[in-house]
């Protein structure tokens, strides 16, 4: 299995100091992976994390700010999720391509995926579950096609 850092098949820190450390923001470079940064970000939602900032300041990267307000236990949970996602990338990337998996999708009578509902919704044991509100949407379309809804009541 590829390591999380130091390999062409990993998610690398894009910027780091000469001593190898990063600041409170880490920019993970996903450009060498067989999936996109968006795929990884959406899968993080299945693990109960808020999707990180995407493609800023570099295309196909994720900016994560883990140390601002998170406990050590939460940081360990994030690292575990990233390690699991790394495995999924090379074992069954469809699970990333279809993420996030909502409660509605997982509980539907129709299941068309080549992985289990449990793998989709509960990739790790958790005492509670954060369910994403919506499944995969086309973020780029939304960014490029601004729709302004202004309701004026007189």
Regions found by a protein language model. Name each.
Residues 2, 47-49, 71:
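Generic detector of bulky aromatic hydrophobic side chains
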Residues 56-152:
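PLP-dependent enzyme catalytic core of the Aspartate aminotransferase-like
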Residues 7-8, 12-37, 47-62, 90-99:
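Conserved small-domain helix->loop->beta segment predominantly found in fold-type I
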Residues 1-6, 10-11, 153:
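Single conserved hydrophobic/aromatic residue that forms the stacking wall/gate
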Residues 35-39, 73-76:
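Generic alpha-helical secondary structure signal
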Residues 39-49, 81-88:
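Generic non-transmembrane alpha-helical segments
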């Amino acid at each position: 299995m590829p390591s999380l850092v130091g390999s062409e098949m990993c998610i690398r820190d894009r910027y780091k100091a000469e001593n190898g450390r990063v600041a409170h923001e880490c920019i993970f470079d996903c450009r060498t992976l067989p999936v996109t940064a968006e795929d990884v970000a959406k899968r993080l939602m299945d693990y109960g994390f808020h999707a990180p900032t995407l493609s800023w300041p570099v295309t196909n990267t994720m900016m994560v700010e883990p140390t601002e307000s998170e406990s050590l236990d939460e940081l360990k949970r994030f690292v575990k999720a990233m390690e699991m996602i790394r495995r999924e990338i090379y074992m069954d990337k469809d699970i990333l391509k279809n993420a996030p998996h909502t409660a509605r999708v997982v509980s539907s009578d129709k299941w068309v995926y080549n992985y289990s509902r449990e793998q989709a919704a509960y990739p790790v044991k958790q005492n509670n579950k954060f369910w994403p509100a919506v499944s995969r949407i086309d973020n780029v379309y939304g960014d490029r096609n601004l729709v302004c809804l202004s309701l004026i009541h007189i």
